[in-house]
Amino acid sequence: GQYSEAIKVAATSPRGVLRTPQTIEQLKQVPTQPGTLSPILQYFGVLLENSSLNKYESLELAKPVLAQGRKHLLEKWLKENKIECSEELGDIVRTHDMNLALSVYLRANVPNKVVACFAETGQYSKIVLYAKKVGYSPDYATLLRHVVRINPEQGAEFASSLVTDADGPLVDVERVADIFLSQNLIQQATSFLLDALKENRPDQGALQTRLLEINLVNAPQVADAILGNNMFSYYDRPRIANLAEKAGLMQRALEHYEDLADIKRVVVHSNLFNTEWLVEYFGRLTVDQSLAALYEMLKSNMRQNLGVVVQIATRYSELLGAPRLIEMFESFRSFEGLYYYLGSVVNLSSDPEVHFKYTQAATRTGQVREVERICRESNYYLSLIHISEPTRRTPI
């Protein structure tokens, strides 16, 4: 009974002269009687009935209340403005309830702890809004690294919001890429960079190259799709060509190579290309490049490459010149190739040499009826007698 009276006296003393840390420490030392509330909690109860608590009192009340698992009381007093919020109180509450700690930090105006709580509770969209409102500038890179480690998917969303902020990027794009790749998060890094680089700016060439590099090494089909969409224009083309070749993306490699030695090395693998695409590709090359590449294809693997070489020779016969193509096939003694190539152009040609070489190739490949037809129907049949003597010695 005496303790109860003493508690009331201390709690209601004029101008709070007895409302001191020393009083609190003394009451904490008083044993609790069975079936009663501890003296210190009785003291705080009287204070809460008549006023609100100061910083020190709030801390000393929070400790036993939270220890007893009665955080709902703390929430009630917080809403009633009965306790004074501080960073120290937030730190105590944080080990029990992150959202309640967030409320404390917000009221106490502790920006760094508020931002940390937003991150811990997954409220990433609120971080930038809050920071701008209170004029606080967090270390967004460090914050992002923390978010990415906890939740990579939300980290990607948060990263995009940081670099596309209305007031300008809040974190460097390359720094963000480093953060994702340091965690080996290739998919998230790709998703982020595709969004961040969508404007296809000249100053982003190095990042375009990096995006393609990481996918050519780790996910070639993704790189193939990106290149196929023609999204970027400023990356290191020779570097990407080389990596595409190593990844087995021969078409992409050939699209990017400009050096003839590189073109010849890749084009010989005709079995790895869509034939129609490969034929169209030769339309981009000069005459000398085309002939050099065709020679290399026949030299490397005639059995594999002859069919597409014939198609290319046929498509670009007028440009490359029949005499040079005839010479090419003859240099490899490919009368089959010569027969199929000339067979596609002979009916449109007025060159006696073409008709003669076709007849000769047909003979060498056993196409007797075709020999008879061309000799019978060719308008240039009589011209064959004017062929030079060395050539006519070859039996037809």
Question: Could you say what each language-model-derived stretch is?
Answer:
Residues 1-388, 392:
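Extended alpha-helical assembly domains of large eukaryotic scaffold proteins
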